[in-house]
């Protein structure tokens, strides 16, 4: 059985008296991972620890079954990193930089040239490969950063805020590119404070707040699947009482209900209650809990 993508054991990281990460525990499976939390939550610090850039103050972490402190070089050979801010040399061409990056990973020069060409084509920069980074748009620079992160064919790529500063078209392009990595067998960890980006690109979610993990689960388990939303015409109190009497979970806002029931056909249950109460119905249909809803609920805690 393959090892988890990431394993954390009592992991903490401090800067002087400031605790950036506090006692993180958990395993993250292989796949497309979303690391989500507000700015300052500890996402970038966690990535730097997982890359072996920062040594943990306490505890341990493994990436692809390798210790980030004891097997750092071997681990780094199997991962890629797209930083939040690029620092790409403005006077260098994309082709030259990608060849250099491939050679740093131990790829011979001739193979590095071919690999650089292939990866630039993949990210849509083949026509711009001989242009200098100083002439690139923000979207092109982001794609170049992604290219350097995968030029050595890693098993896992860390993407720190990969959609930052992009316009809607650029965001769509980056979503597509991140999605394509899965078809090449590359696992991804996408760090973002934009919840819709995580919903679009990931199948597992790690929520972090104040340096602590508050949720670590499959995305579909986090968003909670489908409930039924119904708007009645009158007598909402009677409808709520009838639904609760049948064991349904009910959230009501005026005439609008979100109803979750263990019944095989929730629509039939709701329709029966509406008929018995004579409340009438304006509309009824599926209601999907978004990742943003789940995150806000997790922040508030149980009511």
Model-found features: residue ranges?
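Conserved ABC transporter NBD signature motif
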Residues: 59-70, 75
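Conserved ABC ATPase signature
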Residues: 91, 132-139
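Conserved ABC ATPase "signature" region
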Residues: 99, 103, 110-128
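Catalytic Walker B motif of ABC-type/P-loop ATPase nucleotide-binding domains
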Residues: 157-161
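ABC transporter nucleotide-binding domain
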Residues: 173-261
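C-terminal coupling/interaction segments
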Residues: 262-303
